């Protein structure tokens, strides 16, 4: 693996967790597997970013089912992005998609909340519940792949799989071959409170970028209820150490969402330009 890219010209020191009682999370029971009704909505309600080269005007960021009816001829590379537990309402997601569209890169972020009465939670909850959520999120990769293969303006030979937080777990676990690279935001690829086992399945020859705060409130040692071994790093370095095409970026002192931090955007741009040849 490439030596860690540090966002500042100084070493990042992971903060040791303070001793405290594990807080009680909240769980709102509900549906936890997509249905014949929700599957098409996962895609039609997806948030897409479309470059101006296709719109013949301004970049489009909005629902797939409201995108411009006519696009210019041509194909563009695509990033499939899996949102976190808060859904597509997170402002940074649309901003990130708009930014990538200005680089000539299309994005599609499937809507996990297309499932009526979907289960929701605030951490921590039990691992069995988390794993059911992870399985549902993994199914969304196949749902969106089936759809994008029928979209004429997507170059399916140039696709990257990305996700943040809850959405990053299925990115790390994905075992298919539809994507030429992966971007894992705000997930550490380690055993902790969020999984029974991290089950990372990234081939050692697949380009991969992991970006996370050095003090991530959920997956670094800053979290007093992390539930990880004392050797936990708070990033995917251990799982990527055999991958010479992987990099880990730590953003010092950042919050959980790092999508639009300059220290995250620069490596993402370089990573995608290199993979997509743009």
Language model: regions and residue ranges:
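N-terminal cap/lid segment of alpha/beta-hydrolase-fold proteins
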Residues: 21-74
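Short beta-strand element of the alpha/beta-hydrolase
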Residues: 74-84
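Cap/lid segment of the alpha/beta-hydrolase catalytic domain
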Residues: 86, 112-135
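Short amphipathic alpha-helix adjacent to the substrate-entry channel of hydrolases
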Residues: 91-108
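Alpha/beta-hydrolase active-site loop
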Residues: 127-152
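Primarily recognizes the serine-hydrolase "nucleophile elbow" in alpha/beta-hydrolase
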Residues: 144-203
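The feature captures the conserved acid-bearing segment of alpha/beta-hydrolase catalytic domains
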Residues: 181-249, 256
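C-terminal catalytic histidine-bearing segment of alpha/beta-hydrolase fold enzymes
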Residues: 241-278
């Amino acid at each position: 693996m490439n030596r860690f890219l540090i966002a500042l010209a100084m070493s990042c020191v992971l903060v040791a967790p303070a001793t405290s009682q594990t807080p009680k999370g909240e769980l709102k029971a509900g549906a936890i597997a997509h249905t014949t009704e929700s599957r098409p909505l996962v895609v039609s309600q997806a948030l897409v970013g479309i470059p101006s080269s296709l719109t013949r005007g301004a970049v489009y960021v909005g629902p797939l089912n409201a995108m411009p009816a006519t696009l210019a001829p041509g194909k563009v590379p695509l990033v499939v992005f899996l949102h976190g537990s808060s859904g597509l309402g997170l402002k940074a997601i649309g901003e990130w998609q708009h930014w990538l569209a200005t680089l000539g890169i299309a994005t599609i972020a499937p809507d996990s909340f297309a499932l009526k009465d979907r289960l929701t939670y605030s951490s921590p909850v039990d691992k069995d519940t988390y794993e059911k959520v992870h399985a549902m999120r993994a199914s969304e990769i196949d749902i969106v792949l089936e759809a994008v293969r029928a979209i004429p303006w997507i170059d399916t030979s140039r696709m990257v799989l990305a996700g943040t937080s809850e959405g990053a777990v299925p990115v790390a676990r994905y075992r298919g071959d539809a994507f030429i690279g992966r971007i894992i935001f705000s997930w550490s690829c380690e055993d902790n409170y969020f999984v029974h086992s991290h089950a990372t399945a990234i081939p050692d020859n697949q380009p991969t970028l992991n970006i996370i705060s050095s003090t991530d409130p959920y997956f670094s040692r800053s979290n007093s209820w992390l539930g990880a071994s004392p050797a936990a790093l708070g990033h995917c370095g251990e799982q990527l150490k055999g991958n010479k095409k992987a990099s880990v970026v730590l953003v010092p002192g950042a919050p959980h969402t790092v999508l639009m931090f300059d220290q995250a955007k620069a490596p993402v741009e370089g990573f995608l330009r290199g993979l997509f040849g743009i």
